[in-house]
C-alpha cells in the first residue's frame, strides 16, 4: 500500500458496474434506479468500468470493448450525457457511497483523439506503424510514456475527473511507468484529497514476457508504492 493510504479502505466493499450491461437501458439514469439495492448489499464504493466513447477502428464485435477508448475526456453517448454522469455520481454520494472510474492509460483505440492529434505519443513497430505489445489486443494501440507531454495531458485529465469522482481504478497499471503514477497521485491530491487509487496488476509471467520484449512492466512489489 502507498505511504498515505487510508487504513479504512481495508474494510470497504467495492462493487464493479459495467453500465452497458447493468440495466436493460444501459444508461447512467437507469443505473440510478438500482443504487438503493447496491447500498443494501453493503457496497461502499461504486467502481464504474470505462465511461468514455469507444473507438470504431479495429472494434471487437459490434459494440466494442470499453477498454478501447476513443476520448479520455469524453462521455460514451450510449450511456448518457456529462450532466447525466454528474447526476449519477451525486446520487451515489447522496447514499453515502463513493464513486471511482476506470482509467485506461496503457492504450487507446487506433482512432482515438490522441492518435489523431499526437501520433508521436504512441509505440510504433519496426515499420513505423502504431502498434501494441500484446498481440491479442488488436483493437488498441499502446501509448509511449517517454513523452513527458503525454504525462501532462494524462495528469490534467485525471485532475479534471477528480473534481467529480472519488478515485480511479487504473487498468493495466503495471504497464504505465510507476513514476507517472506517483506524480499523478501527488497532483490529483491537490484536487481530491484522499483520492482512491486502485491498480490492476498482472501475473508474473506477463511481466516477464513484456520485459523480454523490451517493454516496461512493473511487479506487484513495485506497484504498491503508488497505489492503495
Range-by-range predicted roles:
Residues 156, 171-228:
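Active-site-proximal helices and loops of the catalytic beta/alpha 8
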Residues 43, 165-167, 213-215:
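A structural motif
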Residues 98, 167, 196:
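Hydrophobic "anchor" residues on beta-strands that sit immediately upstream
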Residues 2-13, 19-32, 36-44, 50-162, ...:
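Substrate-binding/active-site clefts of carbohydrate-active enzymes
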Residues 47, 100, 169-174:
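Conserved beta-strand positions in the central sheet of alpha/beta enzyme cores
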Amino acid at each position: 500500500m502507498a505511504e498515505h493510504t487510508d487504513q479504512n479502505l481495508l474494510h470497504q466493499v467495492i462493487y464493479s458496474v459495467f453500465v452497458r450491461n447493468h440495466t436493460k437501458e444501459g444508461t447512467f439514469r437507469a443505473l440510478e434506479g438500482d443504487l438503493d439495492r447496491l447500498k443494501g448489499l453493503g457496497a461502499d464504493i461504486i467502481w464504474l468500468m470505462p465511461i468514455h466513447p469507444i473507438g470504431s477502428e479495429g472494434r471487437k464485435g459490434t459494440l466494442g470493448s470499453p477498454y478501447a477508448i476513443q476520448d479520455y475526456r469524453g462521455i460514451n453517448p450510449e450511456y448518457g450525457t456529462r450532466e447525466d454522469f454528474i447526476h449519477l455520481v451525486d446520487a451515489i454520494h447522496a447514499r453515502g457511497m463513493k464513486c471511482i472510474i476506470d482509467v485506461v492509460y496503457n492504450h487507446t483505440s487506433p482512432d482515438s483523439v490522441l492518435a489523431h492529434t499526437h501520433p508521436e505519443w504512441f509505440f510504433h513497430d519496426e515499420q513505423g506503424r502504431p502498434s501494441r505489445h500484446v498481440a491479442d489486443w488488436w483493437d488498441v494501440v499502446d501509448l509511449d510514456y517517454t513523452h513527458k507531454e503525454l504525462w501532462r495531458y494524462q495528469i490534467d485529465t485525471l485532475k479534471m475527473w477528480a473534481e467529480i469522482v472519488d478515485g480511479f481504478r487504473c487498468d493495466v497499471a503495471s504497464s504505465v511507468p510507476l513514476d507517472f503514477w506517483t506524480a499523478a497521485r501527488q497532483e490529483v491530491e491537490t484536487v481530491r484529497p484522499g483520492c482512491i487509487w486502485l491498480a490492476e496488476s498482472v501475473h508474473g509471467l506477463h511481466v516477464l514476457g513484456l520485459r523480454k520484449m523490451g517493454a516496461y512492466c512493473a511487479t506487484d512489489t513495485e506497484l504498491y508504492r503508488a497505489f492503495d
